[in-house]
Design a protein with these regions (language model features):
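Extracytoplasmic
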Residues: 1-29, 218-223
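Extracytoplasmic gate region of multi-pass secondary transporters
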Residues: 14-15, 197-251
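Helix-breaking motifs and short loop linkers at transmembrane-helix boundaries and internal kinks
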Residues: 26, 58, 79-85, 283-285
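Conserved MFS/SLC helix-loop-helix module at the cytosolic interface between two early adjacent transmembrane helices
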Residues: 45-81
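Cytoplasmic helix-loop-helix junction between adjacent transmembrane helices
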Residues: 89-126
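Helix-loop-helix hairpin linking two adjacent transmembrane segments in secondary transporters
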Residues: 114, 123-170
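C-terminal membrane-cytosol helix-exit motif in multi-pass small-molecule transporters
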Residues: 158-178, 367-375
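C-terminal transmembrane helical hairpin of 12-TM major facilitator-type secondary transporters
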Residues: 258-311
């Protein structure tokens, strides 16, 4: 859970310190679009290219190496002096984080007792938005007492403990050859489309894409968009942190509800979040309405992403779990890259805040429709055991 918290913290740290970096380096707001996105490219590389190695080798070793990379490159971020150096550290740290999260979800799902798998995966993934909330608080504290460099020094030193903790306590999970994968052979992305899994795999990818696009787009740009709309900086940062807190609270509820009632819960959550996003664009810079709507959006969309992971971890056989979760998260991270980059283009071209939030709302509606597709699959397979949703 602690490492998942750090994933959320690092994902938000650059957003919270970006105004300070922009002032220090005399950068325009639009310059942060590529910087936000390059770290997410690293998340994609880690999730789809490296995390699946856990299904073929040793998940514990892969996790330790990923955690080591995270610690080294986070600490190095504190000492960058140019935007290109910052982007490079974001890319390398993102590769480590993208590798680590699918491995942790897979190990947690395998280690949890039957009947409690959804609970344990929920607790793990819920740590992500809580880490983002804690990151906002730490960034505010660090910037009041020092510089943006200090924020990355503190987080890098914290991350240095993870490889040691993993070496001592992390369970590797069962080897792939012990899980009895029916089709035999090596596990590849094409395995995710066999045995009638193709439609569910596509729906999972769309749900992850839409959910993570909104989560990272809002997480990265919310402070700057609110400041752009006339809100004081300290209020904008506080609201952005509460967005992540809403994700934590909603994640617990939606993760457990999705485990029990299925993807219909996610469909409703994303639709409700879409309505609230339109509301944020409509109320402008009024602090309390924006705060309450932002917390609600956080509960519905980043919170819904917890349910995505709970469902994904139970959708595939154990032998291909890291591959399935990794590709779902990896394709979702494409949304992470696309969202911040598109907002950067929109801001540079003068699009209004209501227009940007309307686009975000449309993406949430797409995620809701994909969740309906997952729910239809589940309804059409009444004989599937409750502890694993499979299409074979």
């Amino acid at each position: 859970m602690i490492s998942a918290m750090f994933d959320g913290f690092y994902g938000q740290a650059i957003a919270f310190v970006s105004p300070a970096i922009a002032k220090d380096w005399s950068l325009p707001t639009s310059a942060f679009g590529p910087i936000f996105s390059i770290g997410l490219v690293g998340l994609i590389i880690g999730a789809v290219a490296i995390a699946p190695l856990g299904d073929r080798t040793n998940r514990r070793v892969v996790a330790i190496l990923a955690a080591t990379a995270i610690a080294v490159f986070t600490l190095a971020t504190a000492f960058v002096r140019t935007p290109s150096q910052l982007a490079g550290m974001r890319l390398l740290t993102g590769i480590g984080l993208g590798t680590l999260m699918p491995i942790l979800v897979t190990i947690t799902n395998a280690a949890a007792p039957e009947g409690r798998k959804g609970l344990f995966v929920t607790l793990l993934v819920t740590a992500f938005p809580f880490g983002a909330f804690a990151g906002g608080m730490l960034a505010t504290w660090g910037l009041q007492r020092g510089t943006w460099h200090d924020v990355f020094i503190y987080s890098g030193l914290l991350a240095a403990a993870f490889p040691l903790l993993f070496w001592k306590f992390l369970w590797a999970g069962p080897p792939a050859r012990a899980t009895g994968h029916a089709s035999g052979g090596s596990i590849t992305v094409f395995s995710l489309f066999r045995e009638r899994r193709w439609f569910g795999t596509l729906c999972l990818w769309v749900v992850f894409f839409a959910s993570l696009l909104n989560t990272y787009m809002l997480g990265a740009w919310l402070p700057l968009l609110l400041e752009r709309g006339g809100m004081p900086s300290f209020q904008a940062i506080r609201i952005a942190a509460e967005f992540s807190l809403g994700g934590t609270l909603g994640g617990v509820a939606l993760g457990l509800a999705a485990s029990r009632f299925g993807p219909w819960v996610l469909a409703g959550a994303y639709l409700a979040g879409a309505v609230a996003l339109v509301g944020i664009g409509a109320v402008g810079s009024a602090y309390w309405p924006v705060l309450l709507l932002t917390i609600f959006v956080g509960a519905m969309i980043p919170g819904g992403n917890v349910g995505n992971n709970v469902f994904a971890a139970r959708f595939y056989p154990d032998a291909m779990n890291a591959t399935g979760v990794g590709w779902a998260q990896g394709l979702g991270r494409v949304g992470c890259v696309t969202g911040p980059a598109l907002v950067g283009v929109a801001v540079a071209n003068g699009m209004s805040n209501p227009g940007i939030f309307a686009f975000s709302s449309a993406c949430a509606v797409i995620g809701s429709l994909a969740a309906v597709g997952l729910a239809v699959i589940r309804v059409s397979q009444p004989a599937i055991p409750s502890d694993r949703v499979r299409l074979n």
